[in-house]
């Protein structure tokens, strides 16, 4: 997605060779016009799939998933990272490791919101090692739902996330694939 790549080059910040900070437009301050275009692009890429729900993980994926859901006309479910007092105790759970936070945590989805009839599109902001997406795939499969694909805004193509997800038999569509971030410069895969 050229508009997204252009924005990453203009406003993204590289730290080391593996951290890309896009908080000025994607995951802290949100450019809603850009997110609308991202939502349309996800719809275009998955238009041949039957989607009944979009699943993401709190917090950065929620805004992206909600905008995309408008184009699919389906609800969004997000996996919670914390068992709050208002969280249903009857949940599907999966352990995921966060590359960003460098720690593991359990994510949960109420059994009320994912079931055997669901055909789920998983959406997230970043794909690095694939742990978050794989955790969500496991939750959908535990519910006997069907994963229709994984939509990623920015993929770190130099990490193994895509391969990990594809090894589970799931298609990945990334809107921008970063091939490398050497010398503070983002290079995209063609």
Curated annotation (Swiss-Prot):
Reaction(s) this enzyme catalyzes, per UniProt: XMP + diphosphate = xanthine + 5-phospho-alpha-D-ribose 1-diphosphate
Annotated positions binding xanthine: 20, 27, 156
Pathway: Purine metabolism; XMP biosynthesis via salvage pathway; XMP from xanthine: step 1/1
Biological process according to GO: purine ribonucleoside salvage; xanthine metabolic process; XMP salvage
Entry's localization field: Cytoplasm
SUPFAM superfamilies for this protein: PRTase-like
Annotated GO MF terms: xanthine phosphoribosyltransferase activity
InterPro entries, sorted: PRibTrfase_dom (IPR000836), PRTase-like (IPR029057), Pur/Pyrimidine_PRTase (IPR050118), Xanthine_PRibTrfase (IPR010079)
Principal location: cytoplasm
Domain of life: Bacteria
GO cellular component, one term: cytoplasm
UniProt cross-references to CDD domains, sorted A to Z: PRTases_typeI (cd06223)
Stretches assigned to coiled coil: none
Record bears the keyword Transit peptide: no
Subunit structure: Homodimer.
Listed NCBIfam families: PRK09219.1 (NF006671), XPRTase (TIGR01744)
Similarity comment: Belongs to the purine/pyrimidine phosphoribosyltransferase family. Xpt subfamily.
PANTHER family noted in UniProt: HYPOXANTHINE/GUANINE PHOSPHORIBOSYLTRANSFERASE, XANTHINE PHOSPHORIBOSYLTRANSFERASE
UniProt-recorded name of the protein: Xanthine phosphoribosyltransferase
Organism the protein comes from: Clostridium novyi (strain NT)
Record gene name: xpt
